[in-house]
């Protein structure tokens, strides 16, 4: 198993970890009820996906 030959400095470690950003979810408007929803998912508000109701919402 490989072992580090030299200690990784704080600066080098932090530069590498600077790319570990969290991204906010992309949101689009539901074409049926106009609420915000995640694309390519069933709308939580009305249960529609791709122009048809796939989840029965009471």
Curated annotation (Swiss-Prot):
One GO-annotated biological process of the protein: translation
Pfam families attached to this UniProt entry: Ribosomal_L32p
Gene Ontology cellular component annotations, sorted alphabetically: large ribosomal subunit
Sorted UniProt keywords: Ribonucleoprotein, Ribosomal protein
GO MF annotations, alphabetized: structural constituent of ribosome
Family according to the record: Belongs to the bacterial ribosomal protein bL32 family.
Name of the protein this chain belongs to: Large ribosomal subunit protein bL32
Gene: rpmF
């Amino acid at each position: 198993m490989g072992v580090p030959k030299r200690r990784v400095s704080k600066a080098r470690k932090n530069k590498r970890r600077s790319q570990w950003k969290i991204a906010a979810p992309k949101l689009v408007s539901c074409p049926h009820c106009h609420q915000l929803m995640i694309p390519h998912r069933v709308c939580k508000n009305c249960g529609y996906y791709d122009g048809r109701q796939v989840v029965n919402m009471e």
